[in-house]
Amino acid sequence: MPNTVHSGQFNLSSQALVIWHGPAPRADMEEKLKTFIEEGGLVLFLPDDTAHGTRRQFLGVSWGAMETAPADEYFRVESWDRQRGFLRDGTDQTPIPANRLRAIRRKPLAGKYRVLASWDDGTCALGQVRAGAGSALFLTTLPKYSWSNLADGHLLLPLLQRMADRGAERFSSAISLRVNDHA
């Protein structure tokens, strides 16, 4: 959702997941997203692609200034929670291939959040803030090849599938099953 759109143009009550790319939402859109999350919705925040950090926060989290990996090197995801959460292993114990994520650029998070995945230098790659029945997740890189290989889907696709599934639980558990769960 672009920051230039007025919140009155969106009805989030029928949505399971929102993907937000860019600076933190302002005023009425910020309140609308907070309510959406508190009612069980999920929002994935992606940083903007500018070099500077963001002053505005959402649920106490903002992005710092862009960092660039040294020449011929990458930031690599090294650890993530394989037991629970959005990046957990499948029911057959097959891990999400999050360690295939490579980034040239990233924007570190500032604020208080739970780390779901870390880069090889120990900084957060994916953070989570819970609010009410839902959550906001914050990625520190973009699915653009000038930033990372996130668009390859090794981490992003299972993350989005599981977030959409979890967000849909707020509507009716009778019509929604988690990926890899048996009916």
Placement of each model-derived feature along the sequence:
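A conserved amphipathic helix/loop scaffold
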Residues: 1-183
